[in-house]
């Protein structure tokens, strides 16, 4: 593969994963020839650290936007994400239940998935290539090789850090990659992430690809991974596909959104109670007042 071809392929991958749009939105890169910071004549090495500083919060926003689209796929509501996918409700849904907060917190802090199992996916996302058959949005085609390479290097450093890789980011990039495979038009439109731009039916197709550990998806993630890591990658994706749906549903129907951790009380009626018609816990329980007629044993 020629250098030019590699640049086109890497540009396509970063765009499909949602990274380039997030970087542009955060000001980490400017898609013009004279745009800062690239007009100042700084070297690529001098640009990496400030780009990383801008890219980190941009990637967090990318992850949150993607998770918003995922949770509304599971429990739609009256929010913009649900309406955009074509399946919504007049009642509150996962967004109002703060399910994205629950899911991101669970993925990044509590999911019992050791970092060594997440690492193959993170490594794959850091080195993946993709074909350039999917047309990119106009502003992203104006990126210079220096801009592309700088963002690319910043992403690799973030994913290759010795710190624990946020699982929510790894999942978000994977969902966005599959989203553009299902519908290339998801590269364009509202929201930050391609996955959130999909219709409800297309989101279902994307989840099906992940749950089925589609060979094309594994190939797109990293053609350079050795076979043992390919097997690990497939296993992680298969686990993630099912867990995302389950965690989203659990979070939406739990008391998470109105639970006060300090007082350990509910501050309001949980969204899940309203959706399911649950009337709430009983105000009290019958107290034990002794044995009937003083009996303490039974003789047969």
Stretch-by-stretch model annotation:
Residues 1-8:
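N-terminal secretory signal peptides
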Residues 8-38, 199:
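N-terminal export leaders
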Residues 37-47:
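Ser/Thr/Pro/Gly-rich low-complexity linker/stalk segments immediately outside membranes or between
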Residues 274-300:
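Protruding loop/beta-arch "assembly-hinge" segments enriched in small, turn-prone residues
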């Amino acid at each position: 593969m020629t250098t030019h071809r590699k640049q086109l392929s890497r540009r396509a991958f970063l765009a499909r994963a949602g990274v380039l749009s997030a970087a542009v939105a955060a000001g980490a890169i400017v898609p013009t020839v004279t745009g800062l910071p690239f007009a100042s004549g700084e070297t690529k090495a001098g640009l990496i650290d400030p780009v990383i500083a801008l890219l980190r919060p941009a990637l967090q926003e990318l992850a949150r936007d993607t998770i918003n689209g995922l949770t509304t796929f599971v429990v739609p509501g009256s929010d913009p994400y649900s309406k955009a996918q074509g399946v919504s409700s007049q009642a509150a849904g996962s967004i109002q239940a703060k399910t994205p907060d629950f899911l991101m917190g669970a993925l990044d802090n509590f999911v019992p998935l050791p970092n060594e199992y997440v690492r193959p996916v993170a490594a794959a996302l850091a080195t993946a290539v993709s074909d350039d058959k999917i047309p990119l949005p106009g502003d992203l085609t104006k990126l210079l090789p220096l801009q592309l390479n700088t963002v690319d290097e910043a992403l690799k450093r973030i994913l290759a850090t010795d710190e624990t890789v946020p699982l929510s980011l790894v999942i978000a990039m994977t969902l966005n990659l599959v989203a553009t495979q299902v519908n290339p038009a998801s590269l364009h439109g509202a929201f930050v992430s391609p996955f959130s731009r999909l219709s409800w039916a297309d989101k279902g197709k994307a989840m099906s690809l992940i749950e089925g550990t589609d060979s094309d998806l594994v190939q797109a993630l990293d053609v350079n991974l050795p076979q043992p890591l390919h097997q690990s990658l497939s296993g992680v994706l298969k686990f993630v596909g099912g867990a995302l749906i389950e965690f989203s549903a659990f979070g939406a129907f739990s008391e998470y959104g109105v639970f006060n951790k300090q007082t350990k009380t509910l501050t309001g009626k949980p969204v899940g109670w309203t959706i399911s018609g649950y009337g709430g816990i009983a105000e009290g329980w019958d107290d034990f007042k002794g044995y009937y007629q003083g009996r303490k044993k039974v003789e047969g």
